[in-house]
Amino acid sequence: KVAGCIKTVSVFPSNLKAAHDSFLIAVNYAREKKNLEKLKCEAVATAAPIIKKFPKVEKIYKSIKNKYSYSNDKYAIVLPDGITDIVLDGMLLGHCTYRTDRYYDRISTNESYIVFLRKTSDTEMPWYTLEIEPGGTVRQKRTFGDDQLSDLDEAMPFLFEWQSVVAGRLNKSDRIKAQKSKILRTE
């Protein structure tokens, strides 16, 4: 058991690679959780100049939260409250969302958004960071170490389910943004 992150351990898991990947994520999370308060302070400090540079982002997240949030009994799409949450998630998972302006620029123009894929059993534990387009297309899926691991395979049916739900929530303006985003992605 690693700081309460792993409930049971099977000596012979059916998918050894997925079990290994999940264990590594849990170990990293447990290690980072010890330093969580310090990391939160770092995230606030790191986010401050980004918030100043991209003031629309916080407002955009307030306006899209209900449209893109979704969960079932196993997984959840959780939207950040704003830039500080994205920075903290990037720090905890060790990927690039807090080290580049690219994502905040895309968010501020409604080209794409950063959302979090979590396990419903612990929506506070970072698992995957997704970059999504306004129509629900997933551009990127990244976990610990800026990687995409085999444990994501089990969540793919959920992501397709989420995309169907989101498609039903879109209005005309969202569809126009989705078309523009698709064009920008292919350029």
Kindly label every feature range from the protein language model.
Residues K1-E187:
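Glycine-focused motif/segment detector
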